[in-house]
């Protein structure tokens, strides 16, 4: 790992989304994807081991939703977070809750991304 690069951990249950984000971020020489996780429990262990500078976090995942994970993360290991998820009209309040919990950025995931 290059210490001058921004280390990113991608947390998303969709293999397609993890792959697309990894490929897109690889285009930037100053960014290094240090790992991926399919759920918050795996992510927790990887955060401790890999020490990312920033994480991308899906809103809806199995075993623990993104809000619950973000609340725990900000309490015990605060760090920059970019939310990646499908934000519909009904999910607007969810997006606001993420912002309240210190989300660095929220990115709306295109609805077709998981259908590939």
Language model regions located:
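Active-site beta3 strand of CheY-like receiver
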Residues: 50-56
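Active-site residues of response regulator receiver
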Residues: 12, 58
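Two-component/phosphorelay signaling modules centered on CheY-like receiver
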Residues: 3-6, 15-35
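Receiver (REC) domain active-site loop signature in two-component systems and cognate sites
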Residues: 61
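Acidic catalytic/metal-coordinating carboxylates
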Residues: 39-42, 64-68
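Alpha4 helix (beta4-alpha4-beta5 surface) of REC/receiver domains from two-component response regulators
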Residues: 68, 75, 88-115
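Conserved phosphotransfer cores of two-component systems
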Residues: 48-50, 73-79, 101
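Hydrophobic/aromatic residues positioned on beta-strands within the core alpha/beta folds
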Residues: 84-86
